[in-house]
Regions:
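Conserved glycine-rich cofactor-binding loop
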Residues: 12-14
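Conserved glycine-rich Rossmann-like NAD(P)H-binding loop of the short-chain dehydrogenase/reductase
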Residues: 26-42
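The beta1-alpha1 cofactor-binding region of Rossmann-like NAD(H)/NADP(H)-dependent oxidoreductases
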Residues: 55-66, 99
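Substrate-binding pocket helix/loop in short-chain dehydrogenase/reductase
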Residues: 92-94, 98-104
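Active-site helix of classical SDR
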Residues: 117, 154
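Residue(s) in the substrate-gating loop at a strand-loop-helix junction
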Residues: 137
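C-terminal helical subdomain
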Residues: 178, 198-239, 244
Length: 249
């Protein structure tokens, strides 16, 4: 066991859930944040050690500050932040996305990462160490109509935000990495305008695959910073759609 503390947002499902479980198995004390207590409590039963549940809407800066303050009061430090909270909206393209939905996606997917990162960053500067992992997306690197302008814009910004941490705080011993997964079989797929088949989901990257990538980052020597990681399914639907008539049977 170690005495390290990891705070995971979006811990109630998907990548956040599996990251919390795997970090706890590595000996971390995990703090699980998300909007739904029932989901977080369920995840906590799968974690090793003594996980702490903190209800949080990352789009509310005052709520983020409150939870951060409570974590520091309890543990005095945060060694790893995994910012995994994210959403998209079913009506997501230019012809049908509302102002309200656009703002909601930006507030959670971008502002929420900024709020958590900024607070944790200042504490990590005091500690002279720390790892920040922001769960971005394939859409943070490649513009796609599949994800729409709000999500794509937010994730591109997350990548830039993450690298700016390395530029400004690397000399404090702080490392930041944006993980950019392609299609991952998480609940966010259920928000797609066109449903994803179970057969296709099985071929996608799984949440536990992304979690293993986070574990890899935590195991690197502190002198090593992986700025960005792009992950995609071997059977990549984006590639397949372009090669439909050329793929050998």
């Amino acid at each position: 066991m170690n005495d390290k503390i990891a705070w995971i947002t979006g811990a109630g499902s998907g990548i956040g859930e599996h990251t919390a479980i795997q970090l706890s198995e590595e000996g971390y004390t995990v703090v699980l944040s998300g909007r739904t207590r029932e989901s977080l409590e369920k995840v906590s039963t799968k974690c090793q050690g003594d996980p702490l549940v903190k209800i949080l809407d990352v789009s509310d800066p005052e709520e983020v500050k409150r939870v951060f303050t409570e974590i520091i009061k309890e543990f005095k430090k945060i060694d790893v932040l995994v910012a995994s909270a994210g959403i998209n909206t079913p009506k997501r393209n230019w012809h049908n996305i509302s102002h309200q939905d656009f703002d909601k996606v930006i507030k959670i997917d971008l502002n929420g990462i900024f709020y958590t990162n900024q607070l944790v960053l200042e504490k990590m500067k005091e500690q002279k160490s720390g790892l920040i992992v922001n769960i971005s997306s394939w859409a943070g690197k490649y513009v796609s109509t599949l994800t729409g302008p709000a999500y794509t814009s937010a994730k591109h910004a997350v990548n830039a935000l993450t690298e700016s941490i390395n530029m400004e705080a690397g000399h404090f011993g702080i490392r930041a990495c944006a993980i950019c997964p392609g299609e991952v079989a998480t609940p966010i797929l259920d928000k797609r305008p066109i449903p994803v088949s179970d057969e296709d989901k099985k071929k996608m990257v799984q949440p536990e695959d992304c979690a293993k990538t986070v574990i890899f980052l935590t195991q690197l020597h502190p002198r090593v910073c992986i700025n960005e990681i792009t992950i995609s399914p071997t059977w990549n639907r984006d590639y397949v759609s372009r090669l439909t008539d050329q793929i050998p049977s």
